[in-house]
């Protein structure tokens, strides 16, 4: 491979006073330059054309640059490439996805191109690598299917003790081969002895992203609650709760549909056929510098038929109202908890249809108990859902924010703006209202439990 001259601009210098080799080099550079005077020839090419050695050409170019005849111009990395295979190493170091995208778009002329990214964890959760990690997780858990993506993440599990030597093998599958166990053990011990080194060890040797906040709900447990056989027909005529999180008109809006049943004295929850809406422009008119990744998710879900696109730049709430009315025909709606943000008009419309809207402010008071109840129901197997991929994505994006000094009071937040939690928030509100309707003691229940007493 020839050594690249990384870019020089010929300033139209005069040849007077230069050595013959320098004049010849300038002439060759001029031949290679474009209209702006920019050229990208290899040193090997210049040397061959003027009949000089490569070391002579390098020395002459360095002298011409030092004397001001040439100025260095940065070249955009990867431009002009058409690779069969591109390998991006330590992707977490990339501030943007510019190089990755350049390589990917250059593969259009290849029949079986391969884009391969290799990396440890890093510190920039706003960067392209962390976003790619989320994309891989979404593919693996099935919320955003992608047959063109293969990904594998070696890291420790939630709740693992990072100081335990046993966890090293989880994050280092080649332990004892390309990295020695003794080395990892020594680094682990150093991190245990020096708090300043702990984050470095976790990031580089356990693939734990620094600054990344843990998801509140366990997605493995959530997926074990999945029951794709659940249909609305199974709950026809049974009261349900419709909960709405409307977000912004430019963003995704959601409706959760929740049923409850008493089984062996315990409340079981059923999330069936949730609905999601997003405006057309948010899905298909995203500029290159905007949130392309979210738009790609939305497009995939539209193709799957689980996301409804409304015309224009804003969600038309009339679509949502019609869906709520249709839901009421299948199952009588007992209540419609709704986020008050921007929802005044829809709330009035729901009231006109006797769908009993209840305004729920998303604060610690209203969200903590139902959020913890939903977690408990998921872990105990009392929660059942139909596997809607958008709801799964939203659940996986929920991070628990607690009151300082009190980890027992919590509310749902998202780690980043693109990590939508609308469906999860609607579901939590529905669980909160269902908790108020849990079976109460009637006179018959009391007599059955305690018998008749004489006063």
UniProtKB/Swiss-Prot annotation:
Spans traversing the lipid bilayer: none
InterPro entries: TerL_ATPase (IPR046461), TerL_nuclease (IPR046462), Terminase_largesu-like (IPR005021), WH-like_DNA-bd_sf (IPR036388), WH_DNA-bd_sf (IPR036390)
Superkingdom of this protein's organism: Bacteria
Molecular function as annotated in GO: endonuclease activity
Any one Pfam family match given in the protein's UniProt record, by short name: TerL_ATPase
Intrachain S-S bonds: none
Further comment found in the protein's record: Encoded by the e14 prophage.
Family: Belongs to the phage terminase family.
Name recorded for this polypeptide: Protein YmfN
């Amino acid at each position: 491979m020839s050594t690249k001259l990384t870019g020089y601009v010929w300033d139209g210098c005069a040849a007077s006073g230069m050595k013959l080799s320098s004049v010849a080099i300038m002439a060759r550079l001029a031949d290679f330059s474009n209209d702006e005077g920019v050229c990208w020839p290899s040193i090997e090419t210049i040397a061959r054309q003027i009949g000089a050695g490569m070391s002579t050409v390098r020395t002459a170019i360095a002298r011409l640059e030092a004397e001001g005849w040439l100025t260095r111009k940065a070249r955009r990395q990867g431009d002009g490439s058409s690779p069969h295979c591109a390998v991006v190493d330590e992707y977490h170091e990339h501030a943007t996805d510019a190089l990755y995208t350049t390589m990917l778009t250059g593969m259009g002329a290849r029949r079986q191109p391969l884009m391969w990214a290799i990396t440890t964890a890093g510190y920039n959760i706003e960067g392209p690598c962390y976003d790619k990690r989320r994309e891989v997780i979404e593919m693996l858990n099935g919320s955003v299917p992608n047959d063109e993506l293969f990904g594998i993440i070696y890291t420790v599990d939630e709740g693992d003790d990072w100081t335990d030597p046993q966890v090293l093998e989880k994050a280092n599958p080649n332990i004892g081969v390309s990295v020695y166990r003794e080395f990892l053990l020594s680094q682990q011990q150093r991190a245990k002895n020096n708090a300043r080194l702990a984050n470095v060890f976790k990031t580089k040797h356990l693939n734990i992203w620094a600054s990344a906040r843990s998801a509140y709900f366990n997605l493995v447990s959530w997926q074990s609650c999945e029951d794709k056989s659940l249909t609305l027909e199974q709950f026809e005529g049974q009261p349900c709760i419709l909960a709405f999180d409307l977000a912004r008109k430019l963003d995704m809006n959601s409706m959760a549909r929740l049923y409850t049943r008493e089984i062996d004295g315990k409340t079981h929850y059923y999330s069936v056929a949730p609905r999601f809406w997003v405006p057309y422009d948010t899905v298909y008119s995203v500029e290159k510098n905007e949130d392309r990744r979210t738009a790609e998710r939305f497009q995939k879900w539209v193709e799957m038929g689980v996301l409804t696109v409304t015309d224009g730049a804003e969600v038309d709430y009339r679509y949502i109202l019609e869906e709520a009315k249709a839901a009421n025909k299948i199952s009588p709606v007992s209540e419609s908890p709704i986020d008050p943000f921007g929802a005044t008009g829809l709330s009035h419309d729901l009231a006109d249809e006797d769908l009993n809207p209840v305004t729920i402010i998303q604060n610690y008071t209203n969200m903590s108990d139902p959020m913890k109840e939903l977690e408990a129901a998921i872990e105990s197997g009392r929660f059942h859902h139909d596997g809607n991929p958008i709801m799964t994505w939203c659940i996986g994006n929920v991070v628990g924010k607690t009151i300082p000094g009190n980890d027992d009071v919590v509310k749902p937040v998202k780690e980043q703006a693109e990590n939508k939690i609308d469906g999860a928030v609607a579901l939590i509100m529905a669980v909160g209202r269902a908790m108020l309707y849990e079976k109460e003691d009637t006179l018959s229940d009391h007599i059955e439990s305690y018998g008749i007493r004489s006063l």
